[in-house]
């Protein structure tokens, strides 16, 4: 998992509340568990004018010109601005995989669905909760300003606007540590590889029958 400390980037505003995981990545794309390759199908039913299927080359599909991610001014955005209850609906880690695979490192919203919120941290995506008034202000500024960018400082827990306004956010210290170090659950476990190895060696001495081959 790529470490995340400071993110500076273009913001894209998705002005919809209750965006569920089926909208983020439709169910027909859930067969793969590789974590990669989902980016082109992010928001598939909103992004394209035809019906998407696994294996379909998205480069030749008709784009929906009204969908915000397709607008030229937002190309290359790595910060998604959203509304309340982002990531609700069925539990699918693929929703986070699709966002990360499409280049997003941060999602800012007034609230997130609990499971999506947890999955985001496990996959290197920073979900930032700001109060509704602050989010509404960011929507107005993003839509009014071409190339609107934000600076996200995870160590300082701050969002800074181009005008220099600082918006603090809170985050669990353990999750913050994992994001900054680029540690998923496997990486976190491997930090203790020496202790695990020592325990296994000790168990072989204390309880050798557990290791006997039948």
Swiss-Prot record:
Keyword Transport annotated: no
At the top level, the lineage of the source is: Bacteria
Mind listing the UniProt keywords for this protein, alphabetically?
Amino-acid biosynthesis, Branched-chain amino acid biosynthesis, Leucine biosynthesis, Lyase
Catalysed transformations (reactions): (2R,3S)-3-isopropylmalate = (2S)-2-isopropylmalate
CDD domains on file: IPMI_Swivel
Listed GO MF terms: 3-isopropylmalate dehydratase activity
Q: Which PANTHER family has this protein been placed in? A: 3-ISOPROPYLMALATE DEHYDRATASE SMALL SUBUNIT, 3-ISOPROPYLMALATE DEHYDRATASE SMALL SUBUNIT 2-RELATED-RELATED
**Function recorded in the entry:** Catalyzes the isomerization between 2-isopropylmalate and 3-isopropylmalate, via the formation of 2-isopropylmaleate.
Question: Which protein are we looking at?
Answer: 3-isopropylmalate dehydratase small subunit
């Amino acid at each position: 998992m790529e470490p995340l400390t400071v993110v500076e980037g273009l913001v894209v505003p998705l002005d919809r509340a209750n965006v569920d995981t089926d909208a983020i990545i439709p169910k027909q794309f859930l067969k793969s568990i590789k974590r990669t390759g989902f980016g082109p199908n992010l928001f598939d039913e909103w992004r394209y004018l035809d019906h998407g299927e696994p294996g379909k080359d998205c480069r030749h599909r008709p784009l929906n010109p009204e969908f915000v991610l397709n607008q030229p001014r937002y190309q290359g955005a790595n910060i998604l601005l959203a509304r309340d209850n982002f990531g609700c609906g069925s539990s699918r880690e693929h929703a986070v995989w699709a966002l990360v695979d499409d280049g997003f490192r941060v999602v800012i919203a007034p609230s997130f669905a609990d499971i999506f919120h947890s999955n985001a941290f496990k996959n290197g995506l920073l979900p930032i909760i700001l109060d509704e008034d602050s989010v509404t202000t960011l929507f107005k500024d993003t839509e009014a300003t071409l190339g609107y960018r934000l600076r996200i400082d995870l160590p300082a827990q701050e969002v800074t606007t181009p005008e220099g306004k600082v918006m603090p956010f809170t985050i669990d210290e353990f999750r913050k540590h994992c994001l900054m170090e680029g540690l998923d659950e496997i990486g976190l476990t491997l930090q203790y590889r020496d202790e695990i190895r020592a325990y296994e060696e000790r168990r072989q001495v204390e309880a050798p029958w557990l290791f006997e081959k039948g």
